[in-house]
Amino acid sequence: SLSEYAVWLLERSMKTLALRVRAQNNNAKIIAEWLTENPLVSQVFYPGLKSHPNHSIAKKQMNGYTGMLSFELEKSINGKTFLNSLRLIKPSMSLAGVESTILAPSKASHALLGEEERKKQGISEGLLRLSVGIEDSNDLILDLKQAFTKSN
């Protein structure tokens, strides 16, 4: 069973869950749209974009799409430098928190797979997964911009 403190934390968090999820979803959509316009990004994977192959399904089934997106860096971008240049968005395996986090699946969640298997699954060295938090979307975009500048 849960401790009284854990129950209190859970109860307190549930009161703001809808607000936090809505902020994450809104921020993710804004960032996904911004990334599609960035010439240093070759592809953006976000079901809220009309260009996503499953957008019509997501539109029917989801309310807000998600706070998670992935994007592929152009080959000219050094992924490690990009990740290390981020200041507000933190490299982390943690997902769906109030703070934005990012990781390279090829180095984290899929690191134990061989290169051939990762390639079959669409996991390249330049693929990044961004879990968008509730920070101001303009601050997140500024952080991404400066990381692109430093890594190009």
Question: Which ranges hold each PLM region?
Answer:
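Active-site C-terminal subdomain of aminotransferase-like
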Residues: 1-68, 72-101
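PLP-dependent enzyme catalytic core of the Aspartate aminotransferase-like
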Residues: 20, 77, 84, 100-152
